[in-house]
C-alpha cells in the first residue's frame, strides 16, 4: 500500500469516528432542545462551513495545469443539476435526518447508529426500481440484516420500541437520499450540491420548528456544543475529509472503512453516554455489521 492510500485510509477512519461519535452528540442535544430546532441550527453551520470549502476547491481546481474551463453549455448543465440536485437531496436529507433526530430521543445512540447503517444494505435493493443490478451477495446481506434487526430491536413479545421503528424509517429515507445524490452528482458540482442540500434541509427544518415546536435561545445555547459538533465536524469536516481521502483509496476499502461509523456510534454511546446493551442486542449489532460488510463485497467480473 502506497503512502497516499495509507493517508487516505487514515482520513476515512477519522471520518467514521467523527460521524459515529456525532450520534452521541445528537443524543446529548436532545436533553436541551427539540429535534427540528436542532436540525435547523446544525444545518445553518453545515451550510456556512461548506462555503469557504467550495472557494478552496474552486481555486485548487483552477491552479491544476490540466484544468480546462467548461463551455457555456457545460456550465449551464452543471448549474441546473447542482441546483435541482441540491434541493431534491436536501428534501430527502431533511426527512431522513428528522426521523433520526426524533427517533434518537427514544432509543440509544448505539442502536441508532446500527439501524441507520442499514441504508447501506437498502440502497442496492431500492436501486432495482432504477434498473440497477443487485448481486446475490446483496440479498445475503439483506437476509442477515433482517436477523440482526430482529435481535437488536424486536422484544420478546414481538413488539418494537417506537424509537427503533422511527430510526428504521430514517434508514429507508437515507437510502432514498443516497440514490438521489447518485442520480445528480455525475453532472453536478458535488460540493456545491452538498451546500445547497444543507441549506434546503436548514430552511425546511426552520419551517417545521416554527410550525410544531418551541424554540428558545436558552435551549440552543445549552445544546451549543452538540450543534457545533454535528454541524461543523460531522457535516463540514467529515464531508471534506471523505472527498479528499476517497481520491486515493480503493472504493471497496473506502466503503468498508466508512461502515465503521456504526461501530464508533456504539462505542461513543458507551463511553460518552454510558449506554449499555443486552447480550441479544449486542449480538444483533454484530450480525447487522456483518450484513453491511457482506452487502459491499464486490464480486469478480465475469470474463
Per-segment meaning from a language model:
Residues 22-23, 54-116, 151, 231-249:
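Specific transmembrane alpha-helical segments of multi-pass solute transporters/efflux pumps
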Residues 43, 51-59, 67-69, 223-225, ...:
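C-terminal-most transmembrane helix of multi-pass membrane proteins
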Residues 20, 24, 90, 94, ...:
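Hydrophobic/small/kink-forming positions within alpha-helical transmembrane segments
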Residues 36, 46-50, 123-124, 159-213, ...:
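Transmembrane alpha-helical segments that form core, pore/gating elements
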Residues 39-41, 112-118, 181-202, 235-271:
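Helix-helix packing/entry segments at the starts of transmembrane helices
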Residues 1-40, 90-91, 95, 99-102, ...:
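Glycine-/small-residue-enriched transmembrane alpha-helix faces in small-molecule transporters
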Residues 4-9, 32-40, 78-82, 139, ...:
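Juxtamembrane helix-entry segments on the extracytoplasmic side of multipass membrane proteins
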Residues 50, 134-154, 174, 205, ...:
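Hydrophobic transmembrane alpha-helices of multi-pass small-molecule transport proteins
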Amino acid at each position: 500500500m502506497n503512502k497516499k492510500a495509507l493517508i487516505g485510509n487514515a482520513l476515512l477512519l477519522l471520518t467514521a469516528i467523527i460521524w459515529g461519535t456525532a450520534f452521541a452528540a445528537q443524543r446529548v442535544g436532545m436533553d436541551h432542545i427539540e429535534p427540528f430546532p436542532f436540525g435547523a441550527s446544525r444545518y445553518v453551520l453545515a451550510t456556512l462551513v461548506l462555503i469557504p470549502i467550495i472557494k478552496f476547491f474552486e481555486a485548487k481546481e483552477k491552479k491544476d495545469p490540466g484544468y480546462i474551463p467548461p463551455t457555456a453549455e457545460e456550465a449551464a448543465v452543471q448549474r441546473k443539476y447542482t441546483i435541482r440536485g441540491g434541493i431534491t437531496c436536501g428534501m430527502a436529507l431533511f426527512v431522513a435526518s428528522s426521523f433520526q433526530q426524533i427517533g434518537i430521543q427514544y432509543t440509544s445512540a448505539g442502536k441508532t447508529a446500527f439501524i441507520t447503517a442499514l441504508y447501506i444494505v437498502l440502497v442496492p435493493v431500492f436501486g432495482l426500481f432504477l434498473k440497477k443490478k443487485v448481486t446475490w451477495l446483496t440479498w445475503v446481506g439483506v437476509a442477515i440484516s433482517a436477523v440482526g434487526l430482529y435481535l437488536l430491536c424486536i422484544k420478546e413479545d414481538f413488539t418494537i420500541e417506537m424509537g427503533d421503528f422511527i430510526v428504521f424509517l430514517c434508514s429507508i429515507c437515507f437510502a432514498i437520499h443516497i440514490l438521489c445524490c447518485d442520480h445528480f452528482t455525475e453532472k453536478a458540482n458535488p460540493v456545491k450540491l452538498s451546500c445547497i442540500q444543507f441549506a434546503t434541509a436548514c430552511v425546511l427544518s426552520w419551517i417545521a420548528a416554527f410550525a410544531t415546536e418551541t424554540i428558545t435561545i436558552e435551549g440552543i445555547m445549552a445544546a451549543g456544543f452538540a450543534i457545533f459538533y454535528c454541524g461543523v465536524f460531522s457535516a463540514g469536516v467529515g464531508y471534506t475529509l471523505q472527498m479528499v481521502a476517497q481520491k486515493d483509496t480503493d472504493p471497496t476499502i473506502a466503503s468498508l472503512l466508512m461502515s465503521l461509523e456504526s461501530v464508533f456510534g456504539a462505542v461513543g454511546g458507551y463511553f460518552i453516554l454510558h449506554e449499555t446493551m443486552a447480550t441479544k442486542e449486542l449480538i444483533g449489532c454484530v450480525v447487522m455489521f456483518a450484513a453491511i460488510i457482506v452487502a459491499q463485497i464486490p464480486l469478480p467480473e465475469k470474463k
